[in-house]
Regions:
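Short, polar/charged alpha-helical segment
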Residues: 25-33, 40, 45-66, 159
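Extracytoplasmic ligand-binding site segments that recognize negatively charged/polar headgroups
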Residues: 42-54, 70-79, 92, 96, ...
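Short, well-structured alpha-helical segments in soluble
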Residues: 82-91
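Boundary at the C-terminal end of the N-terminal hydrophobic targeting segment
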Residues: 18-22
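Bacterial N-terminal signal peptides
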Residues: 6-17
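Extracytoplasmic/periplasmic substrate-binding proteins
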Residues: 243-306, 310, 356
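Conserved C-terminal helix/tail region of periplasmic/extracytoplasmic solute-binding proteins
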Residues: 24, 258, 365-398
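Mature extracytoplasmic/periplasmic domains
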Residues: 298-299, 303-372
Length: 398
């Protein structure tokens, strides 16, 4: 009897497994051909809309998939629609095939069984994701991803200022308060539930909290008032010195950018480290604009795409999600003039050609280096979002 060496058995099993994996993906590609994917995603940025249009053209030409960008203002409205479809027992032929999502919205979809999956382990490009150095690709606002959404890009809160208008910038929220008191009317932030406004108050809360520990656990109603007291105390001090004396707030980062350009405010914000450089290149902001983060860091996270449970084009959605993770698509997304959205890939896992292309990416004049952006504060538990927004509106939106 011939004994097969153990190493050959291992190699044989690996080959069989790889073939099965490859065959499954080829079947997905075949089924995706001719499908129409309704991609529900925020439509408030022209450059992002253009990028999505480019990506849609690529999968149309290569795979025969039609991607329709359904521009939405608040992805929470889409979740409400999916909940209604589930209540009506519409388990197939849903109105949404793919959605841009993260944080509390992902948590809500996961808890209400509105997600298709797990699926990301089936995507060939998933193996290129930097799961080692980017923990937020695996944990979304403390909610385990569990292969139920595919990482798309990275984000970190940055502040924008015009170096021609101010000689220094604050390096903490306490310094921002002092800055506002010294420059009345020149500081503001968007009103929650604007994503930017909610992020701003979360940043405040993380900086002024007596202890951060409760913020990384689900909200306890009995402890909410005590835990958030330092936040409201800080905002009560800040608002009288803000733009329009804190009686009115901007709608989002784009409006803040315009106010910064007009000289009405001295500090704006963004969740894209390349945003200011893009704005300079597009003529939206002067060349003297620069960016910074706080001394102890700022909130950072990952944004994802997810497939609803009743998608009528699950295969097409998976192929599109896989393309969005390709080195080609991630590189283009990282170019400042295109979007400037940081990659979720581990560049060291890429081919020499792709690695070189990422290394040659231009760093805009107002863009912080990776070393300068290395202090990332993890998002609080997703349950804090709704609780903070509700209390903020009760206090200040009268």
């Amino acid at each position: 009897m011939v004994t097969i060496p153990k190493i050959l058995l291992i190699l044989f099993s690996l080959i069989i497994g790889a073939n099965a994996y490859g065959n499954e993906w080829q079947n997905i590609i075949r089924k995706a051909d001719g499908q129409k994917v309704y991609f529900n995603a925020w439509g408030g940025s022209g450059i992002i809309n253009d990028y999505i249009s480019w990506a849609a053209d690529q999968v149309k030409n290569r795979y025969g998939i039609t991607v329709k960008h359904v521009k939405v203002t608040d992805i929470g409205d889409v979740i409400s629609r999916l909940l209604a479809e589930k209540s009506a027992n519409r388990t197939q032929a849903g109105s949404v095939d793919l959605m841009w999502i993260n944080g509390e919205n992902f948590k809500a979809m996961k808890e209400n069984s509105l997600l298709f999956g797990p699926f990301t382990q089936k995507l060939p490009n998933y193996q290129l994701i930097d799961t080692e150095n980017k923990p937020t690709v695996l944990s979304d606002f403390t909610t385990k991803v569990d292969h139920m959404e595919a990482p798309w890009g990275m984000a970190q809160l940055i502040f924008i200022y015009d170096s021609n208008k101010i000689n220094y910038h604050p390096k903490s929220m306490q310094e921002l308060l002092s800055f506002a008191q010294e420059n009345p009317g020149k500081v503001t932030y968007p009103a929650p539930p604007s994503f930017y406004g909610t992020t701003f108050i979360k940043q405040v809360m993380l900086e002024v909290a007596v202890s951060k520990d409760p913020l990384y656990l689900p909200v306890k109603v009995s402890e909410f008032a005590k835990t958030t007291r330092p936040l409201w105390k800080f905002l009560d001090k800040l608002h009288p010195f803000m733009w329009r004396k804190g009686k009115a707030f901007t709608s989002g980062a784009p409006e803040m950018k315009q106010l910064l350009n007009d000289g009405e405010i001295f500090i704006s914000l963004s969740f894209n480290p390349n945003d200011a450089s893009n704005a300079i290149a597009n003529g939206e902001l002067p060349e003297t604009v620069r960016t910074y983060i706080h001394r102890e860091g700022t909130i950072g996270n990952t944004h994802f795409v997810a497939i609803p449970f009743n998608s009528s084009a699950k295969e097409g959605a998976m192929v599109f999600a896989n393309f969005l993770l390709s080195p080609e698509a991630q590189l283009r997304k990282s170019i400042p003039r295109i979007w400037g959205d940081p990659t979720v890939l581990n560049v060291n896992k890429l081919s020499a050609k792709d690695k070189s292309a990422f290394a040659r990416l231009p760093l805009g004049v107002a863009t912080l280096t990776a070393a300068e952006l290395n202090k990332v504060i993890l998002e609080p538990d997703a349950s804090w979002v709704a609780a903070l927004e509700k209390e903020w509106q009760r206090r200040y939106q009268k």
